[in-house]
Every structure is written in C-alpha cells, then in structure tokens.
A protein has these predicted regions:
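Electrostatic, structured charged patches in enzyme active sites and in nucleic-acid/phosphate-binding
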Residues: 1-101
C-alpha cells in the first residue's frame, strides 16, 4: 500500500500544487520501493493529465525523499525549482538508474 508521509500545498499563479512526499532511508533501493516509486509516479502523471484535460488548476508533484536530500529538497521548494519539476532526490536517481539496468 502507498501512504505518503506528508503533503505540501502551494498556491502560485492561480494553480494549486500538491507536493506528495514519501520519506525513506538513504539508499533504500529495495525492489518494494522501486515498485512503489514506479507506480506512484505513473499514478500522479495520469492524475495530472486528467486534471489538465478537465481544466482543473491543480498539479501533483511526487517525490521519494531520504535524509541525504532534505536540505536540497527544501532549497528547491523555497526558490521555486521544485514546482518546475527540477528536483530529483539521490534516492530517486538510484531507483531510476537501477530500474533501467
């Protein structure tokens, strides 16, 4: 089952952004986490497409986050790069690289 640890809501330029975060241990690239990450990313991509199609001004941004990326995550949140989807945690990079090997 998928139970995000926290949500952050930000209103900007008439759009409600919902940042959905699941916190994991550093380097926890288990098969279970690979599957959760893959399906959660797809779920939120599909949801965002449906919201756009229905002209609903909401967007969901999903991240797996671990302690070694906390500082960078909050810096990207503070300066707006997170809303532009320019952030990827170390754990996400590891999950993606191992997923495509």
């Amino acid at each position: 089952s998928f139970n995000p640890d926290f949500f952050i809501k930000i209103e900007e330029n008439g759009i409600s952004y919902y940042i959905v975060v699941e916190v994991k241990s550093d380097n926890d690239a288990s098969d279970d986490n690979k599957a959760k990450f893959k399906y959660a990313r797809q779920h939120f991509q599909d949801l965002n497409k449906e919201l756009a199609r229905e002209k609903i001004k909401q967007k969901y941004i999903f991240h797996f986050l671990s302690p070694n990326s906390f500082t960078e995550f909050f810096q990207y949140l503070k300066d707006g790069r997170l809303l532009k989807e320019q952030f990827s945690s170390e754990l996400e990079s590891k999950l993606l690289s191992e997923d495509y090997e």
